[in-house]
């Protein structure tokens, strides 16, 4: 297993002789190095400009923020060892800070400068709580952040992935795997936190893992074990997020969702943030504005406390990578609540808004004040633009098969398996992406035999979720489990079926066909591996 994981990363970055090792995101030249996502240049790493739209300056500031977070991790771990409590606001900063560096989240230099300054203050605060530290603090803990942005950019080369040319490649790969897993888990922890849910166990692991990423004494085996530990921590984190979502908005139930346009003003909501959607629905009720989900917000239609709003009209478009085409000259407003944002085209830059950790230079941002967001600018823009002029012929798809809904069919599923009506289960899902060849997932789904069931989740579902797969008895052949974090639901379903058949998960007639794009997929992969789940393709 270890060799496969190392190969996963080693094959995705440029070898030492192929890039300028001394320059990583500094301000004096057009250079960077980032290999955290699937679409990196030539499959090795972005060295001039990010395929995602990230420029070298933003890349450098992100690297430096991760560097600062490693320093915070060092002092945080020391405090935890001494049973000294770390305040919730610092836990939140750590998860939000690491989340902000995830692919397609934030591209705003000034926001990163603010985060860096806050990180430096927190690092000093934590250091000040340790009376004596008879230990060798890493450079990340001792580093002092300069005041101005240009100096930060000059310093950022020390934070670059490839800065230490002598570092063992396997150690580098496992460190980066750990950091990318944290970025994904940071997203899930953030979404749970804004709903009032968190786990001290998960929060403590952020400090432990960040400190480990700066610890030069750790071996390949040490780092491998930490990656598996991260997988377990992320499973707990996804469990907390599932609880947050279901206790706040109810258990998802099978629901038909309109995927065609309705006449009138509208707002498209993209990302993953259920709380933002709830607040927007409250603020638009009775105003004649339709609300459409986009991308990973599609599963929101299945939550009782969200779908009770009649103006939650439907789902618009497909996965994240099509947004520049789908939002082009759109006669409505767009709200980006989390990743994935792409560079807005001029044709809709005046009507797209960001919130939470999302940022793009010169794009309107909706601030949160005392836990509330005022979406008046978004609402006014939607009314000003007027919306679509006529209805389209209706088409609907089915969502809402989280673990609670799917397991309500457990007896029927078990009987169908025993009677030979269901021969196999395929989980086809994960992050979608723009690279050619992803029609593989469409073709795979189409070729699955009619006596098999397809479970799907995350935005990879858009490759086939508008196709008709029919039914097996009373059960649809295609079951939409939810967002990427609902991998937790998929695991719960698999574990429940394994219990029912008195076998292990790997003995089930189950195959996982996964796609990846960014770091949430990395932490989910680590979770699956840490649970010992096999048959992953």
Where are these regions (language model features)?
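Anaerobic metallocofactor- and corrinoid-dependent redox/one-carbon enzyme cores
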Residues: 22-41, 46, 54-58, 62, ...
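Short, Lys/Arg-enriched N-terminal segments with co-localized hydrophobic residues
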Residues: 4-20
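Long, compositionally biased, glycine/small-hydrophobic-enriched stretches that function as flexible linkers
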Residues: 22-251, 255-264, 268, 288, ...
């Amino acid at each position: 297993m270890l060799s496969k994981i190392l190969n996963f990363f080693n094959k995705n970055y440029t070898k030492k002789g192929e890039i300028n090792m001394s320059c990583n995101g500094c301000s004096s030249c057009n250079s960077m190095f980032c290999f955290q996502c699937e679409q990196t240049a030539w499959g090795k790493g972005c060295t001039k400009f990010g395929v995602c739209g990230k420029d070298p300056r933003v890349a450098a500031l992100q690297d430096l923020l991760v560097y600062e977070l490693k320093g915070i991790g060092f002092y945080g771990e020391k405090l935890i060892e001494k049973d000294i409590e770390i305040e919730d606001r610092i836990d939140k900063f750590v998860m939000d800070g690491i989340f902000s560096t995830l692919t397609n989240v934030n591209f705003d230099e000034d926001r990163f400068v603010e985060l860096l300054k806050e990180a430096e203050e927190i690092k000093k605060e934590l250091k000040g709580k340790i009376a004596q530290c008879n230990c060798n603090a890493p450079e990340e803990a001792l580093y002092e952040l300069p005041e101005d942005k240009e100096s930060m950019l000059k310093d950022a080369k020390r934070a670059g992935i490839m800065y230490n040319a002598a570092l063992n490649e396997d150690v580098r790969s496992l460190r980066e795997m750990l950091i990318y897993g944290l970025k994904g888990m940071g997203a899930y922890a953030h979404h749970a936190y804004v709903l009032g849910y968190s786990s001290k166990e998960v929060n403590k692991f952020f400090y432990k893992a960040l400190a480990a990423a700066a610890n030069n004494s750790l071996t390949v085996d040490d780092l491998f074990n930490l990656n598996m530990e991260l997988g377990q921590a992320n499973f707990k984190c996804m469990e907390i997020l599932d609880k947050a979502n279901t206790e706040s908005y109810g258990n998802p139930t099978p629901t038909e969702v309109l995927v065609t346009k309705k006449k009138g003003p509208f707002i498209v909501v993209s990302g993953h943030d259920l709380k933002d959607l709830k607040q927007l629905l409250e603020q638009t009720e009775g105003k004649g504005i339709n609300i459409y989900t986009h991308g990973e917000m599609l599963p929101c239609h299945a939550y009782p406390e969200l779908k009770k709003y009649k103006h939650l009209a439907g789902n618009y478009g497909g996965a994240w990578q099509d947004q520049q085409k789908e939002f082009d000259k759109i006669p409505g407003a767009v709200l980006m609540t989390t990743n994935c944002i792409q560079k807005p085209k001029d044709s809709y830059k005046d009507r797209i808004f960001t919130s939470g950790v999302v940022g793009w230079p010169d794009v309107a941002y909706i601030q949160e004040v005392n836990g509330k967001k005022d979406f008046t600018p978004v609402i006014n823009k939607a009314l000003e633009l007027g919306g679509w002029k006529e209805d389209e012929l209706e088409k609907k798809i089915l969502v809402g098969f989280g673990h609670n809904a799917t397991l309500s069919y457990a007896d029927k599923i078990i009987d169908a398996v025993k009677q030979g009506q269901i021969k196999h289960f395929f989980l086809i899902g994960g992050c979608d992406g723009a690279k050619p060849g992803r029609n593989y997932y469409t073709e795979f789904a189409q070729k699955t035999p009619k006596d098999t069931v397809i479970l799907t989740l995350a935005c990879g579902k858009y490759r086939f979720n508008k196709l008709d797969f029919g039914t097996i008895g009373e059960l649809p052949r295609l079951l939409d489990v939810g967002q990427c974090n609902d991998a937790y639901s998929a695991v719960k379903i698999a574990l429940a079926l394994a219990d029912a058949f008195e076998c292990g998960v790997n003995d089930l007639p189950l195959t996982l066909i996964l796609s990846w794009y960014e770091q949430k997929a990395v932490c989910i992969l680590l979770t699956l591996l840490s649970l010992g789940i096999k048959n992953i393709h």
